[in-house]
Amino acid sequence: MEDVDARKEMMNAAMMGGLSGCNSMFGLAHGTGHALGGIFHMPHGRTVGLFLPYTLEYIINGSEEALVKIAEIARYCGLNAGSDKECAKALIARIRTLAKEIKQPLSVKECGIDKAQWEKEMEGLVNRALNEVMTMTAPRVPGTEDLEKLFRYAYDGKSIDF
């Protein structure tokens, strides 16, 4: 027998998650995470979580409006580090710390993906991310060149500086 109440609550939770996602600027993390998970058959939460700090860095480096919003979120979380940029970076650092605490990978390399295989799949990764509707909703929408760099930085665990 189905638990109709449980199904209803799950549906509501999924809807609320989707609505909050559309308003929270994590579209680029989803676009890149979907590409990684789709090609390398990895869990959705792991791939999106892995890309979250990289994509937030990318966004704050190119969108003043997003920087202000991310800094506001950081301050709400008690990360009052000074300027908007410092607060946003503190939030990103906290996300990385949390990933370490829960033993999640901080780079694609830590997922056990071979560098040669990664490079072989680069065109597919970029094309999937470019055509992902979640990527298109980001406050800073990357082109092919930026996505390639972002994917390569994430492979090595290098902070985004562009």
Residue spans for each PLM region:
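Residue-level detector of well-ordered alpha-helical segments, enriched
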Residues: A6-E9, L28, T47-F51, K69, ...
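Gly/Pro-rich interdomain helix-loop hinge
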Residues: M42-E119, I160
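Short coil/turn segments at secondary-structure boundaries
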Residues: E2-D5, E86, K109-G112, T137-E145
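Short, amphipathic C-terminal "tail helix"
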Residues: E119-F162
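Short alpha-helical scaffolding segments that buttress acidic/His motifs in well-ordered protein cores
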Residues: M10-G18, L52, I95, A99, ...
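Alpha-helix N-cap/helix-initiation sites
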Residues: D3, F26, G45, K115-E119, ...
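Carboxylate- and glycine-rich phosphate/diphosphate-binding segment that chelates Mg2+/Mn2+
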Residues: M1-S24, E145
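Glycine-rich phosphate/pyrophosphate-binding beta-alpha loops
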Residues: M15-V48, E132-T137
